Amino acid sequence: MILSDQDILARLADGDLAIEPLEDVDLQVQPASVDVRLGRRFLEFERANVPCIHPNREDEVDEYVTETVVEDGDEFILHPGDFVLGTTKERVEVPRDLVAQVEGRSSLGRLAVVVHATAGFIDPGFNGRVTLELSNLGKVPVALTPEMRISQLVFTELTSPADRPYGDERGSKYQDQDGPQASRIRGDREFGGTQ
């Protein structure tokens, strides 16, 4: 069951669902979602003369990623064909009986901006800022301003609370992230990790 605005507000008031800072409830809480705003930090992938990046080699992934922090009053220009990682301003804490889905806002979609490539699902137990996989599918650059409403979170109630939620007990790779995170796929079992 997808939570309505009434359900979202009740869960926020109870404190088991947290979205902070939620500075303008009337603006951000929609009929069946919550608009979240763009943070100031971005990870950009450098164009390099390499045949490929091996996801399981930390040095290769880290070598081709640079962080940009947008200052007050400035904007981040997302160029056609670019893919960058951004983050939400808000931290989100999802209780054991809910999942969240990251969806794009229609107004940005009409400018050819997408907010996630594949990672649009937030597990029960997640706590942190949401990493956004931003792309410009259009033909002209788009200026993104920190604190603009960039995406929406849709919450769905599980049939029962998760017995093994996302989090520290599972060694979850992205728990408590405070900004955009590059791939940590090297932590997966098939690459010698524990997950």
From Swiss-Prot:
* Gene3D superfamilies per UniProt: 2.70.40.10
Q: This protein is called what? A: dCTP deaminase, dUMP-forming
Q: What is the lineage of its organism?
A: Archaea, Methanobacteriati, Methanobacteriota, Stenosarchaea group, Halobacteria
UniProt KW Ribosomal protein keyword? no
The pathway where this protein functions is: Pyrimidine metabolism; dUMP biosynthesis; dUMP from dCTP: step 1/1
Subunit field text:
Homotrimer.
| Originating gene | dcd
Q: Where is this region: Disordered?
A: 161-195
Composition bias type Basic and acidic residues, residue spans? 165-176, 185-195
Cross-referenced Pfam families: DCD
What residues does dCTP bind to?
A: 105-110, 123, 131-133, 152, 166, 173, 177
Q: Which UniProt keywords apply?
A: Hydrolase, Nucleotide metabolism, Nucleotide-binding
Do you know which InterPro entries this protein is assigned to? dCTP_deaminase, dUTPase-like_sf, dUTPase_trimeric
Where does the entry annotate site (Important for bifunctional activity)?
A: 120-121
Enzyme nomenclature, EC number: 3.5.4.30
A molecular function (GO) held by this record is: dCTP deaminase activity
Q: Name one GO biological process term.
A: dUMP biosynthetic process
UniProt keyword Repeat present: no
Reaction equations catalysed: dCTP + 2 H2O = dUMP + NH4(+) + diphosphate
Task: State its role.
Answer: Bifunctional enzyme that catalyzes both the deamination of dCTP to dUTP and the hydrolysis of dUTP to dUMP without releasing the toxic dUTP intermediate.
Q: Which residues form the active site?
A: 133
Q: Which family does it belong to?
A: Belongs to the dCTP deaminase family.
